[in-house]
């Protein structure tokens, strides 16, 4: 995949997210920046699966030095390597052994999947959905040597937009 040729939207209501890991997968993939190939990073050490589609927003730079991460919540699993237009509803703030690591929380635009069209902000998601996401990230590195995660909590769409804007500016230098 050549991200340079991808028409990237940074509109909070129609954001391009490259899916690296499909919902329910237990394999962590990462896009190789040089080749554009989707590389297997590792199989999760614990008996867990990703609770949502997981990827990144192209042409951004998060506080961890990589493109900013994004979870795309949907009842379906999107193919790894696909690009989904999504709308921001919040952000998960966490810290791991490498430092701060924000995860944007998004839903597919209604044209792609109208199932959750009523969700406009993080507080519109069920407590159970947020608890599953939080639990996954609190525990998915538990069995890996020298790795840890501390989930700081969820913030609203306004905070997510600030994280996105900061990541765009960091990418642009």
From Swiss-Prot:
* A GO molecular function held by the record: magnesium ion binding
Name the positions where Mg(2+) 2 binds. Answer: 69
Q: What catalytic reaction does the record list? A: diphosphate + H2O = 2 phosphate + H(+)
GO cellular component annotations of the record? cytosol
The record lists Mg(2+) 1 as bound by 64, 69, 101
What Pfam families does the database record attribute to this sequence?
A: Pyrophosphatase
Task: Please give the PROSITE patterns that the UniProt record associates with this protein.
Answer: PPASE
Kindly list the places in or outside the cell where this protein is found, as annotated in its UniProt entry. Answer: Cytoplasm
Query: Which cofactor is recorded for it?
Result: Mg(2+)
Give UniProt keywords alphabetically: Cytoplasm, Hydrolase, Magnesium, Metal-binding
Any signal peptide, and if so, which residues?
A: none
Q: What is its EC number?
A: 3.6.1.1
* InterPro entries assigned to the protein according to its UniProt record, in alphabetical order: Pyrophosphatase, Pyrophosphatase_sf
Q: What EC class does the entry list?
A: hydrolase
GO annotation terms (biological process): phosphate-containing compound metabolic process
| Matches recorded under CDD domains | pyrophosphatase (cd00412)
Which proteins does it associate with, and in what oligomeric form?
Homohexamer.
Q: What does this protein do?
A: Catalyzes the hydrolysis of inorganic pyrophosphate (PPi) forming two phosphate ions.
State the family it belongs to.
Answer: Belongs to the PPase family.
Q: Can you say what this protein is called?
A: Inorganic pyrophosphatase
> What is the organism field in this record?
Helicobacter pylori (strain ATCC 700392 / 26695) (Campylobacter pylori)
Q: Which gene encodes it?
A: ppa
């Amino acid at each position: 995949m050549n991200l340079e040729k991808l028409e990237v939207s940074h509109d909070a209501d129609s954001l391009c997210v490259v899916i690296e890991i499909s919902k329910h997968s237990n394999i962590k993939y990462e896009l190789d920046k040089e080749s554009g190939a989707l590389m297997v990073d590792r199989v999760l050490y614990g008996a867990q699966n990703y609770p949502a589609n997981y990827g990144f927003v192209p042409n951004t730079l998060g506080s961890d030095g990589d493109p900013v991460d994004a979870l795309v919540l949907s009842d379906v699993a999107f193919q790894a390597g696909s690009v989904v237009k999504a709308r921001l509803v919040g952000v998960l703030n966490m810290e791991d052994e490498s430092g701060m690591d924000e995860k944007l929380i998004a839903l597919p635009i209604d044209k792609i999947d109208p199932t959750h069209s009523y969700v406009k902000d993080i507080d519109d998601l069920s407590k159970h959905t947020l608890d599953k996401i939080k639990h996954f990230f609190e525990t998915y590195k538990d069995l890996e040597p020298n790795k840890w995660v501390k989930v700081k909590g969820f913030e609203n769409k306004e905070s997510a937009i600030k994280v996105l804007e900061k990541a765009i500016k960091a990418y642009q230098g």
